[in-house]
UniProtKB/Swiss-Prot annotation:
Keywords: Ubl conjugation pathway
CDD domains in the record: UBCc_UFC1
Protein name in the entry: Ubiquitin-fold modifier-conjugating enzyme 1
InterPro entries associated with the record: UBQ-conjugating_enzyme/RWD (IPR016135), Ufc1 (IPR014806)
Family recorded in the similarity comment: Belongs to the ubiquitin-conjugating enzyme family. UFC1 subfamily.
Length: 174
């Protein structure tokens, strides 16, 4: 955590670490891991809300807990930019981090793979590997998606690659 800003350090240390090393193929152990994931996500969400930093909503979209969908948003120049968020839990989870997808901005930045999967290889994947199995979905959002949004969304907005929903509605009316 050396070289990290104090806010990120503080946030990360308050997200509960997970203990169960289990993936989708591991039956009852996976159910236990999912319980830990939910506890960690709830703690992270509550922490964000209490700090007036609420920026995502996700939930498992299938009973097995292997497909997750939701919304994330980023505020730039006092305008809220909202995006669909989705990801699948890999079979090799937790050894392999989930690939977070923002399909609406697929192809609009070089820091993204096909299908809207955000690039996390350089900074996040080594951190995930070092902290496996203690890191979970909440950690992927905190250390993967949040910094990616902070780095990429302002550039995409300023270059005109993405437009605010109000701007898009106004230009469609004209």
């Amino acid at each position: 955590m050396e070289g990290w800003d104090p806010n990120t350090k503080s946030t990360l240390t308050r997200i509960p670490l997970l203990t169960t090393k289990a993936g989708p193929r591991d039956g009852a152990a996976w159910t236990q891991r999912l319980k830990e994931e939910y506890k960690s996500l709830i703690a992270y969400t509550q922490m964000n809300k209490s700090n007036d930093n609420d920026w995502f909503r996700i939930s498992a979209s299938n009973p097995e807990g292997t497909r997750w969908t939701g919304k994330c948003w980023y505020v730039h120049n006092l305008l809220k930019y909202e995006f669909d968020l989705q990801f699948d839990i890999p079979i090799t989870y937790p050894a392999t981090a989930p690939e977070l997808e923002l399909p609406e901005i697929d192809g609009k930045t070089q820091k993204m793979y096909r299908g809207g999967k955000i690039c996390l290889t350089v900074h996040f994947k080594p951190l995930w590997a070092k902290n496996c199995p203690r890191f979970g979905i909440a950690h992927a959002l905190c250390l993967g998606l949040a910094p990616w949004l902070a780095a990429e969304i302002p550039i995409l907005v300023d270059s005109g690659a993405i437009k605010h929903k109000d701007d898009a509605a106004t230009s469609a009316e004209s």
